[in-house]
Amino acid sequence: LLAAVEGDQPFIVLADENGKDPVRTQNAGRITPEMGLPDAEWAIFAEGAARVAETVKKETGLRTVFHHHCGGYVETPAEIEKLMSMTDPQLLGLCFDTGHYRFGGGDPLGGLDKYIDRIWHFHFKDFNPTAGRKSAVEGWDYFQSVQNGVFCELGQGEIDFAALVAKLEQSGYNGWGVVEQDVLPGMGSPKESARRNRQYLKSLGL
């Protein structure tokens, strides 16, 4: 059905099972190299991602992007770089998520520059630095960090979306841009949050 959609063809968004590994979940936002996958498991991981992308392409004609995500095995800039270096750039693209990239220790504008040719799908997600620092001090796990607003509404955090949008436009990017906003129980109305985020995007000319 997805392959039959007219207009801009959708993507299959692939991610690992976020929030299942206790160490990764507990230390989201402060992952160290020692918490990463061993080389042998990286090989299996990358091969699995490539196999999914290849099968999807062959059977449906759709392309696949990988969504890096805090609380999973591909969180930090180094881990994203490793997966990208181990997979075919013609086969597997990157779903670049600004909030997860920042919480994972990266600079979103720098990441956009680095992977601009590999980014086929883009997630608008803001980052609250105060909540991020408190997460580190208090030792919050991934879900506690989200509940405490580490991924705030657009325009309420530190990410420079105007600069990111300008860079996307300069590069000729014409793919999807999706707002991924976490609104857990007790965090307000998802509908009102979506409305405010839409107004913010309009302020950027989108």
Task: Name what the model sees in each region.
Residues L1-L94:
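Active-site acidic/histidine proton-transfer and metal-coordination neighborhood
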Residues A50-E54, P77-F96, R102-L206:
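Histidine-acidic metal/acid-base catalytic patches
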